[in-house]
């Protein structure tokens, strides 16, 4: 049936003519996001209001594209905290490896995906941009009370819900 290609095209267009359009009016109509969708990264706080991040650098090591940069500092009481914490969202692929690697549940991915900017340098978020006021998804978790690390004023085993260290030599026969 040579020469009837125009008729096939006309029929295809005619079938789609009366079908409802699939265009979504985005800003007014929000798309459905699955419950575990991964979007913008945030840093959370303890129930006491302190930063959860202990600058262990596991998130930066786990990141496959190397978009996380941080430097560790030590507070007066012996706690570690990030002196600076930067995420370059222009490079981030939102894989969630940083969230899985974080031992303190400080890094969490939210369903917020609207990160468009006019300039690329605006997509580099600092610690003050990433910190939120709440605890995020993990409630009531205090890393420093279960870490087993001595801080000023408390030796190992003196924190809440913490057993004293085991004397290994005392276990020998």
Swiss-Prot record:
UniProt source species: Rhodopseudomonas palustris (strain BisA53)
Cofactor(s) recorded in Swiss-Prot or TrEMBL: [4Fe-4S] cluster
HAMAP family membership: NDH1_NuoI
4Fe-4S ferredoxin-type domain sequence ranges: 41-73, 83-112
Coiled coil, from the record: none
E.C. number: 7.1.1.-
Membrane topology: Peripheral membrane protein
Protein name, per record: NADH-quinone oxidoreductase subunit I 1
Sites where the protein binds [4Fe-4S] cluster 1: 53, 56, 59, 102
Sites where the protein binds [4Fe-4S] cluster 2: 63, 92, 95, 98
Keyword vocabulary terms for this entry: 4Fe-4S, Cell inner membrane, Cell membrane, Iron, Iron-sulfur, Membrane, Metal-binding, NAD, Quinone, Repeat, Translocase, Ubiquinone
Protein family per UniProt: Belongs to the complex I 23 kDa subunit family.
Enzyme's top EC category: translocase
Record's GO cellular component terms: plasma membrane
Gene responsible for this protein: nuoI1
Molecular function terms, GO-annotated: 4 iron, 4 sulfur cluster binding; iron ion binding; NADH:ubiquinone reductase (non-electrogenic) activity; quinone binding
Pfam families: Fer4_7 (PF12838)
